[in-house]
Amino acid sequence: MRKPPIISEPSNKEKKNILFLIASIGGGGAERVGTRLVSEFSKNHNVYLMYFNFKEKTFPISPNVHLIPFFVTNELKKEFYPKVKDSNLIRILEIEKVRRRYNIDITISFLFSPNIYNIKAGGGGIKILSERNDPEGKGDSYFKEMALAYEKADKVVFQTNYVKNKFASEIKKKGVIIPNPICVSCLADKIPKKKIVAVGRLVPQKNHELLIKSFAIFHKIHKEYYLNIYGIGPLLDQLKILVYDLGIQNYVNFKGFCDDVHEKIKDAEIFVLSSNFEGMPNALMEAMMMGLPCISTNCSSIPEIIDNEKNGILVEKDDVSGLARAMLRLSEDEILREKIRRNAMRKSEEWRLNKIVSKWEELFY
C-alpha cells in the first residue's frame, strides 16, 4: 500500500494540494471517471485519493496519485467507541486529519456520501461537489439532502444543464457544467455484423424489457440479426424468462460483465440505450465516440447528448413499437447510419479527456 508523503507546502506556487473523495476505486461509471481524472490532475498537482469501500476489481490509477484507503472495520470502531458510534462521523474525522496533515487546498467529491463528508468535515480549502446522477431517480430525501450540501459548497459540478436546472437559483449560480471525459480503446468496424448491442446494468432503470420487446418485433422482419446485452444485475433471470416467452432465445445473448467491452461491441451495426432515466451515460457516449449509430430513449439529459436525427435517434420512454421502428430505419438505411456515425464522432470531440481536465482545472484558481 502506497503511503502519501507529508507535504507542508506546494513546491510550485501553481501546484495545488488536492484531496479527492470517492466511495471506491472500482465498480461503476462515476468511479471510473474519478480515477481517470485524478490520474490526469496528478501531472500538475499533488493529488490524494481517499476512498472508503473495498472492491476487488479496481480501475488503473497513476502512481503519482497518493492513495488513502480508509475502511471503517469493527476493529476501528472499537478505537472510537464509546465517544463516536457513527461510522460516517469516523470518516468525517479522518478526512479532517488528512486535510490538516497534507495542507489541502481543494477537496473534490463524487457521489452522495463523499459529497456529504466533504461539507461536514472541517478545513479543506475550496470544496467542490459533483453530482453524478439524475436526482429524478433518487427520491425526495436524496434531493433535499444534496441541495443542503450544495448550498454550502464553493462550486458544484453538474454533468448537464438538465440536472443543474432542477436546483434553486443560489445553487445554479455556483454550478458549472463539465461532462464526463470519454476514452475508447477502438473504433467501430467499417463493415458491421448483423448485431444490435446494449451495455448497462440489468436493473429497472435501464429498462432492458423495452429493448427486448422491441427487438422481438424487429426480429420478425429481420431474422438475421442478434441482440447482445452486456452487463450484470438482479433482473437477469427475469429478462431471460421474457426472452423465452417471446421465442427469441436463440437470438438474444446475455454476455455479462467484460473488461474489453469496446472490443466486443465494435462490430455491431446499432447501439441502443433504453433507460428510464440517466445522469450522463458513459456507455452511450463511448458508443458514439467509437462511431456506432445509436438509438436512445428521450429521457433526462439525453437530448444534450443526442441531437435527434443528426447524431442519433431518440424514441420516447416505454414506446415498444417506436423503438422497433427506429431499429428498422437504421438497419435498412445505410446512408442514415453513416450520417449519424459521422456526426456522433464529431460531437464526441467535446468529451476528449484533455478538454475535460482543462475545464476542471479552471475551478482550482
PLM feature segments, named:
Residues 91, 109-115, 131:
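Short His-centered aromatic/hydrophobic patch
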Residues 162, 181:
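Carbohydrate-associated surface elements
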Residues 240-256:
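Nucleotide-activated donor-binding/catalytic signature segment of Leloir-type glycosyltransferases, i.e.
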Residues 257, 276:
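Aromatic "clamp/platform" in nucleotide-sugar-dependent glycosyltransferases that forms part
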Residues 293-296, 306:
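Short hydrophobic beta-strand element within catalytic cores of glycosyltransferases
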Residues 308-309, 313-320, 329-334, 349:
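Conserved acidic donor-binding segment of nucleotide-sugar-dependent glycosyltransferases
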